Amino acid sequence: MLVLGGAGYIGSHTALELIRTGESVIIADNLATGHIEAVPKDAKFYPGDLHDKAFLDNIFENEQIDAVIHFAAYSLVGESVVNPLKYYDNNLCGTKILLDSMVEHHIDKIVFSSTAATYGEPENIPILETDRTQPTNPYGETKLAMEKMFYWTSKAHGLRYVSLRYFNACGADKSGKIGEAHNPESHLIPLILQVPNGKRESISIYGTDYDTPDGTCIRDYIHVTDLAQAHILAVKYLKNGNESNIFNLGNGVGYSVKEVIDKARKVTGHPIPAIETPKRAGDPARLVASSEKARKILGWNPVHDSLEEIISDAWNWHKNHPDGF
């Protein structure tokens, strides 16, 4: 199994879960945003970049690869708006070269880490896989374009793929040995936990007058270990000969910003001061994905779905690794 971007947050957790099932794992990562310390010791690591076809060819020629899990992409919404060409180059051009090499070496199964940002402003809540896709930023645009690359490559070359669309990955492995470590950090739960860790004095709440019960944005949070299991089930789905497919992943339950902060206060025992600030442009009031299709077809059943457990596992990582790896 080749895990591209396996030194990153979700990729490293998926690699670890694969190894726990007895799978032989090869990781390729350019370490632009990943961490060598996150690579499981039982995985074989290749440092390199998707843009380097010879690098990919070498892996496919020298390793027994029957499927690819693709996490190797830039994923910061704000950065993608400021520097869209960086995202088109890395996410699209890199994936095109990957597909060239896969087709050449007859590797016909890929599971792809997509995003619910492909939907843009949702028409319905919870969001279904059949809903309109109209991204509102270059990051979401590149992920949607990657899905279309897989679709047309499947038509032309027999590739089969699964695209997994999800929102807010969070939490950390129960061992506490790996977790979330972004620089700069942009995700809510790690930002909140920087307060009890002494890294910031308070957490900002962007907007308190949304059309939600407490006035703050509602989001769908999903434990990274549950996400990892979904990727493993998707590989199994393809290995069983099933056709290409797209699945949403989520708990189907949204939590507001205030609810997340309150739960973090309970878990950490810290007061975590919060400062109310104006809304940010483009933040929808509510984003929750329906994962009924994944539950029915993949047999996926998230088990770490309580907000308290998610934050407890994240805190277990962050309090012992305040500076990341």
Predicted regions located by residue number:
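Hydrophobic, Gly/Ser/Ala-rich alpha-helical and linker tracts in large acyl-processing enzymes
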Residues: 174-185, 194
